[in-house]
């Protein structure tokens, strides 16, 4: 049986919020089977729990932001969610003492390292997957994203930037996640931004925590980071990383084929909402056989609970 996963033990880290630049403390805690992923604002009294669910995504302007009915929010959740998806964590309590998750180095890799350091524990309940049965597509002008039936999880993603430094890199990438590709191929891809946009955001009291330590920064012609890129196609791979995190708001790993062109947080969420609303297009599946093989490769090792 392919089992649900949580952490073996709690683990904490400290970082900086991207938009306000404040120090943020983050703790990841184990959770019982069938809990899901819960963000907990421990800076509030009483604490407020916000589940990672597609219908709670109510702001996608600069990042993915969860907002509950009382207007309590947790922002910049997508990189952490991508790490949880890539490692295959189903259940966790995510404690944070701010309205935004720390940006760390702008990628998912620090969160992957945290999860690996905490250890992965398999639970007694079967892991649920969302299997795509029928195509679902959303469009916004020339941008589009679609989910198609597929045995496993595959992404074909394309971006289209006229910037010379981005045009010189690969703007199309295809990855089949039946191989253990997320940690090696995707997790280290950093967010990126343009100096002219960053200056505007800071004038409006945003992106105050942004720096060369947590983003790839470009001027009109070139990459300004002295250490260059981590992948030749880091720009499109970061957009893929964002999509993985955004789609994990469905609460389960997807078995299907994501194809996307110039998709961002808003379109990713629209696609997930459209999928969940069209009940004939998907189904929950589990793999209960004793020798069942996971259709998506997740990081190992893991220990088994009683």
Curated annotation (Swiss-Prot):
Enzyme class at the top of the EC tree: hydrolase
| Cellular-component GO terms for this entry | membrane
| Record-listed E.C. numbers | 3.5.1.108
Query: Which biological processes are named by the entry's GO terms?
Result: lipid A biosynthetic process
Domain of life assignment: Bacteria
State the Gene Ontology terms under molecular function.
metal ion binding; UDP-3-O-acyl-N-acetylglucosamine deacetylase activity
The cysteines covalently paired via disulfide bonds are: none
Among InterPro entries, the record links this protein to: Ribosomal_Su5_D2-typ_SF, UDP-acyl_GlcNac_deAcase, UDP-acyl_GlcNac_deAcase_C, UDP-acyl_N-AcGlcN_deAcase_N
UniProt catalytic activity: a UDP-3-O-[(3R)-3-hydroxyacyl]-N-acetyl-alpha-D-glucosamine + H2O = a UDP-3-O-[(3R)-3-hydroxyacyl]-alpha-D-glucosamine + acetate
The answer on whether this UniProt entry bears the keyword Magnesium reads no
Query: Which cofactors, by name?
Result: Zn(2+)
Record keywords: Hydrolase, Lipid A biosynthesis, Lipid biosynthesis, Lipid metabolism, Metal-binding, Zinc
The record's active-site residues are: 265 (proton donor)
Q: Summarize where Zn(2+) binds, as residue positions.
A: 79, 238, 242
Family of the protein in this entry? Belongs to the LpxC family.
HAMAP family, alphabetized: LpxC
Q: What is this protein called?
A: UDP-3-O-acyl-N-acetylglucosamine deacetylase
Q: Which organism is it from?
A: Idiomarina loihiensis (strain ATCC BAA-735 / DSM 15497 / L2-TR)
């Amino acid at each position: 049986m392919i089992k649900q996963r949580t952490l073996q033990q709690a683990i904490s880290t400290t970082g900086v919020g991207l938009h306000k630049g404040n120090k943020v403390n983050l703790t990841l805690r184990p959770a019982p089977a069938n809990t899901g992923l819960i963000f907990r604002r421990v800076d509030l009294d009483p604490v407020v729990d916000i589940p990672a669910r597609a219908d709670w995504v109510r702001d996608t302007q600069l990042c993915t932001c969860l907002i509950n009915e009382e207007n309590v929010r947790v922002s910049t959740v997508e990189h952490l969610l991508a790490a949880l998806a890539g490692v295959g964590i189903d259940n966790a309590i995510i404690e944070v003492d701010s309205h935004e998750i720390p940006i760390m180095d702008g990628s998912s890799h620090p969160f992957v390292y945290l999860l690996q350091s905490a250890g992965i524990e398999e639970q007694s309940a079967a892991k649920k997957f969302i299997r795509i049965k029928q195509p679902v597509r959303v469009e916004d002008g020339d941008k589009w994203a679609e989910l198609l039936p597929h045995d496993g999880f595959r992404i074909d993603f394309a971006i289209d930037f006229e910037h010379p430094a981005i045009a010189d890199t690969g703007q199309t990438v295809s990855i089949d996640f039946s191989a253990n590709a997320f940690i090696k191929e995707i997790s280290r891809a950093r967010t990126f931004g343009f100096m002219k946009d960053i200056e505007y955001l800071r004038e409006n009291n945003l992106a105050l925590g942004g720096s060369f330590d947590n983003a790839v920064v470009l001027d009109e012609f070139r990459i300004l980071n002295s250490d260059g890129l981590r992948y030749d196609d880091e720009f499109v791979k970061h957009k893929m990383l964002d999509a993985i995190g955004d789609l994990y708001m469905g609460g389960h790993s997807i078995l299907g084929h994501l194809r996307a062109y110039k998709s961002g947080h808003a379109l990713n969420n629209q696609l997930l909402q459209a999928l969940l609303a069209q009940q004939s297009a998907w189904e929950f599946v589990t793999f209960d056989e004793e020798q069942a093989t996971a259709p998506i490769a997740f990081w190992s090792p893991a220990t088994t609970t009683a």
